[in-house]
Amino acid sequence: MALMRIRSFVLILPCLALLVLCAGAPPALGDTDLETPQQLFQDLFAAVQDAQIFSDGKSFVDAVPNSAPNLILQEFRAQRPESKEALAQFVAAHFTMPSSAYAAPSPPQQVPLLEHIDRLWDELTRRTPTAPTYSSLLPLPQAYVVPGGRFREIYYWDSYFTMLGLGDAGRSDLIDGMVSDFAYFIDTFAHVPNGARTYYLSRSQPPFFFAMVGLLSPQDPAAAYARFLPELRREHAFWMEGEKDIRAGHAHRRVVALADGSILNRYWDDSDAPRDESYREDTLLARSSGRPPQQLYRDIRAAAESGWDFGSRWFADGHSRATLETTSIVPVDLNSLVYGMELAIRDGCERNGDAACADEFKRHAMQRRAAINRYLWDASGTYFDYRWTQRQRVPRVSAATVYPLFVRLASSRQAHAVAATVRARLLAPGGVVTTPTATGEQWDAPNGWAPVQWITVAGLGNYGESALAQTIACRWLSNVEAVYQRTGKLVEKYDVMDLGKKGGGGEYPAQDGFGWTNGVTRRLLKLYPDPARCARELSALPRS
């Protein structure tokens, strides 16, 4: 019966219709209901992934078993299919394969880009108050927008950028529902998982929940923060778990105590096993890396929590995935977002008349700001990540340097210095490049991503760098339009060095859809509606 409780929201939907979240406790969850496909299917799982029955390992972990996992496993062990063909037949007989989140292209000559984006919202919307029995999918009470392609479930940080466009499209219903879904996750699991799958529960993603909540009441965000204060505080507790007992120079889960006792955060994952969705890639890398496998798996998973999986930011040698050191890094973006979360909690506490809480979180935020300035700010005009295990900054420029501007942490002097760094090191013909380093990884050159563009444009705008912000926006819009004119699609990532091309690299082919690209592009089309200006930006660029 526990399985039925986790898989259905039928009983709680009436109260969700009246309130954003039910006042009572969420449905009871049994531990066995939350086992991942790797845990459920054991040697069958390893055999399927190692044999590469599917070109994308995520296909198998998203498949729905046709009967109880223990019975399927027993039958597998009895039959022991030895050939790849026999194993594929066994899988086909015992599992129902998932479909992709298809986003139909439009003929660009007939459908303008903005109209195409608005057509896609319904195509990418899912409602899963129940999930198939034994599925890895986590059901959610409200409708939500998925990114698209292989990403057929809701994702944490993607959703903030998707919501930007939903708001401009008049889809406040979806924003309200998605915020409620994330609040439900926090109330149920004490954090927002990477995505709505059992195999994502051991990690989160960049904590944008406070920013999503702010979208509910743009003119008075404190009112929304007050409404969701329990969830904001619970998520903060998740990221800060262990801070009170940690000694200087040590780390525990997501908190790091630096040499002077300052507390900052890192990315982490509670599992040190290969990822379910990328099992084969992880085990092959471990075999060739010469590193203890569990240590490498933890750093792989922590990079997945960062959302930047993968890129040179996390590589000890700057170019090889085998040298991943994510858990040794105190990142600029994460600590900026936790600072923003702390200010949001302060504002919510003030609105609720809780002065002690407001003072506490103001103090947390000010201490974090001081530590960021002490450890991450560099006189060259850049915020760098910090390698806490060696007490040194990592002197590599990345678009993460703009996050302190996004949450208004930087001073005016720092912000204008960062703007100069963006102009000199990151500005490209098609927008902002993620890093200037070309490694073949998807979070490096020549790729640009929608979230990077928005964080940069919004951050620069916070400090009066409007001309540079508009240049970036126009270049991004021109690039998105060029790909749309050629393909009729919006995609996950773009080549910002060579206009009109999709981005490449990574563990899987470029995906269409695409939630956060749609959201950011639609918001930028509203903020910068002058096509003539963007045309001038494009015409001034050198042709390859």
Each PLM stretch: what is its role?
Residues I186-F228, Q511:
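Aromatic/His-enriched, Gly/Pro-containing loop or helix-boundary segments
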Residues L21-D31:
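Bacterial Sec-dependent signal peptides at the C-terminal "C-region" and cleavage site
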Residues L40, A47-E153, G177-V192, A196, ...:
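Extended glycan-interaction surfaces of carbohydrate-active proteins
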Residues I12-A23:
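Bacterial N-terminal signal peptides
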Residues Y155-F185, A400-S411, Q453-S466:
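Alpha-helical support elements that line or immediately flank enzyme active sites
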Residues L216-R227, I345-E360, Y463:
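Inter-helical turn/loop segments and adjacent helix faces that build the functional surface
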